[in-house]
């Protein structure tokens, strides 16, 4: 490598010496129409030596000799221009103060020399790039022919990477929807209308690379257009990573709130001692990561799953001096009290819960004990140990619940919010499904596709709301930041998604139209439509994605008695109905 660099330096240095001397000679020759009077020979030779030293010096200063052929760009051309301009300026100053030494000397030769030397030195360096660019390219066996969608700077970067062979792609054309760009050049390609994709598909091209920055709705529309044209492999080019990645279902479905407020969350968490229950779950682990990200002083991670706790502890191992993993069930009040007395958290983020509807239907007693009694024990212990704020993660399934899980979460809302007072601020945050959470529909579909199995869903009309887990958790923390105590916050999850449409899109993205979709029938307690969430009577907050739902406190003595009854009753569904009158238990499914 050192030899190669030395060889390159020697080549460029030798070439530049020849070209600089040649440009001085040609400058004089052009000035005198090819016949240089002998009287000017002295001035020409002196100026050639001085200009040679000055130009080489400035080219070294601007690090031009460290640039390889293939990395020569407009930026390097600009540096050469400035280096040569400064060299000519310094020569002019020398000439101005020591003109007698040069006389006679034609001043116009300075300008001509500058133009020629820039042309020669720049052309030398760009020559290899030009040869590579204009050399007819042939597709290698391992490369995939593709269409580039979007005549942008991203596209130019993509085309450059493809030429260098770093992407495994072989672009055959560039298309764009903007009429003003049609017929212009993007690299060596003439930009064509999107409709041209049809003819490329007929020629066997099945891959499209999106080189545009698009909003989600625009991306969804473009994806559908590309599929309609016959494209079966859609990728998005990442400029920062210099790679073309597969478009994902998350790109097409996830709601991405525009009112995420990092500063508010940082102010809320910075230098605080925070306890997260259910720390190893999908929501809990993201809460832990964001607590560390936004400057929590100490994070206590509580979970009763050894594996989940190990996983999040390992993920945050770089911050081990700031985290404490506690393997503990929140049903163990004595141990929980010891933890709170030892670490004195100022904030508890309660994410521990059983969340899977079918399992809770089959194990209603366990759902009641874990969700309701566990929440009650944690909330009571927090208040007794003077924790300042308690934020509980709730669910859209708590709205007019039809299943045991949703109803237990509604009871948790009633209990925790009724415990709120001026010394113990409690808030609950409801939201829908997060993309990729354990046991949810998207990982299930991905596994079925990987195993060549049909995609199963319970009803063709079933719909759900989706949000990326990181965005949902940040909105939870923003809600916690603005909570004064007693609020039932609701997150705007965007538009509902039909699960059958989700299944079809995932098959398209996987190029697996050979797999079928099977309808299995609604399960016990399952809703067709989650009744999320935003009601016209809900109060707005400073964030457009966060609302406050109406909620009434209940008599705690009465609620405590009903919770005691839940633990010993024979019919849990009936006992829950006494607490939550709007509970309409779908025991049979469809």
From Swiss-Prot:
Keywords for the protein's UniProt record, in alphabetical order: Lyase, Membrane, Transmembrane, Transmembrane helix
Cellular compartment(s): Membrane
Transmembrane segments: 9-29, 42-62, 80-100, 101-121
Gene: pglF
Superkingdom of origin organism: Bacteria
One CC-aspect GO term: membrane
Family (UniProt): Belongs to the polysaccharide synthase family.
Listed InterPro entries: NAD(P)-bd_dom_sf (IPR036291), Polysac_CapD-like (IPR003869), Polysaccharide_Synthase-Rel (IPR051203), SAM-dependent_MTases_sf (IPR029063)
Binding site for substrate: 355, 433, 441, 458, 523, 526
Protein name: UDP-N-acetyl-alpha-D-glucosamine C6 dehydratase
């Amino acid at each position: 490598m050192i030899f190669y660099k030395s060889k390159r330096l020697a080549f460029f240095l030798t070439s530049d010496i020849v070209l600089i001397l040649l440009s001085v000679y040609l400058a004089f020759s052009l000035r005198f129409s090819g016949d240089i009077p002998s009287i000017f020979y002295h001035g020409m030779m002196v100026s050639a030596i001085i200009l040679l030293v000055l130009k080489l010096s400035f080219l070294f200063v601007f690090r031009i000799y460290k640039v390889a052929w293939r990395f020569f760009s407009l930026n390097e051309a600009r540096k050469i221009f400035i280096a040569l301009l400064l060299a000519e300026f310094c020569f002019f100053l020398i000439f101005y103060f020591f003109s007698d030494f040069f006389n006679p000397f034609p001043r116009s030769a300075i300008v001509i020399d500058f133009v020629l030397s820039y042309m020669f030195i720049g052309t030398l360096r760009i020559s290899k790039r030009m040869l590579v660019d204009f050399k007819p390219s042939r597709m290698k066996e391992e490369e995939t022919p593709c269409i580039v969608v979007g005549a942008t700077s991203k596209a130019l970067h993509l085309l450059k990477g493809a030429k260098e062979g770093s992407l495994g792609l072989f672009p055959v054309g560039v298309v764009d929807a903007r009429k003003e760009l049609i017929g212009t050049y993007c690299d060596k390609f003439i930009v064509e209308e999107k409709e041209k994709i049809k003819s490329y598909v007929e020629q066997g091209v099945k891959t499209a690379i999106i080189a545009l920055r698009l909003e989600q709705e625009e991306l969804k529309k473009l994806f559908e257009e590309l599929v309609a044209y016959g494209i079966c492999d859609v990728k998005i080019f990442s400029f920062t990573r210099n790679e073309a990645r597969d478009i994902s279902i998350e790109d097409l479905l996830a709601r991405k709130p525009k009112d995420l407020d990092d500063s508010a969350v940082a102010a809320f968490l910075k230098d605080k001692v925070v306890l997260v229950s259910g720390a190893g779950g999908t929501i809990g682990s993201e809460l832990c990561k964001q607590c560390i990200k936004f400057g929590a002083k100490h994070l206590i991670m509580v979970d009763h799953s050894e594996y989940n706790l190990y996983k999040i502890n390992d993920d945050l191992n770089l911050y081990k001096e700031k985290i404490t993993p506690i393997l503990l069930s929140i049903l163990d009040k004595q141990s929980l009290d010891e933890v709170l007395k030892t670490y004195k958290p100022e904030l508890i983020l309660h994410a521990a819960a059983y969340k899977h509807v079918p399992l809770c239907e089959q194990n209603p007693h366990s759902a009641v004990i874990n969700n309701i009694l566990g929440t009650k024990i944690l909330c009571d212990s927090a208040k007794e140990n003077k924790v300042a704020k308690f934020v509980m993660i709730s669910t859209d399934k708590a709205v007019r619940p039809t299943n045991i899980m949703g109803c237990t979460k509604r009871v948790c809302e009633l209990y925790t919010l009724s415990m709120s007072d001026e010394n113990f601020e409690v808030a609950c945050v409801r939201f829908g499904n997060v993309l990729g959470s354990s046991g949810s529909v998207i990982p299930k579909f991905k596994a079925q596709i990987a195993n060549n199995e049909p995609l199963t869903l319970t009803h063709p009309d079933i719909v759900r709301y989706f949000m990326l887990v990181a965005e949902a958790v940040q909105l939870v923390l923003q809600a916690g930041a603005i909570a004064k105590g007693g609020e039932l916050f609701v997150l705007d999850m965007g538009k509902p998604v039909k699960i059958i449409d989700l299944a079809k899109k995932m098959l398209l993205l996987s190029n697996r139209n050979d797999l079928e979709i099977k309808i299995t029938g609604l399960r016990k307690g399952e809703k067709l439509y989650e009744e999320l969430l935003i009601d016209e009577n809900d109060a707005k907050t400073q964030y457009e994605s966060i609302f406050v739902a109406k909620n009434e406190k209940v008599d705690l003595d009465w609620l405590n008695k009903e919770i005691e009854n839940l633990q010993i009753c024979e019919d849990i569904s009936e006992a829950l109905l006494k607490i939550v009158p709007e509970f309409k238990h779908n025991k049979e499914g469809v």
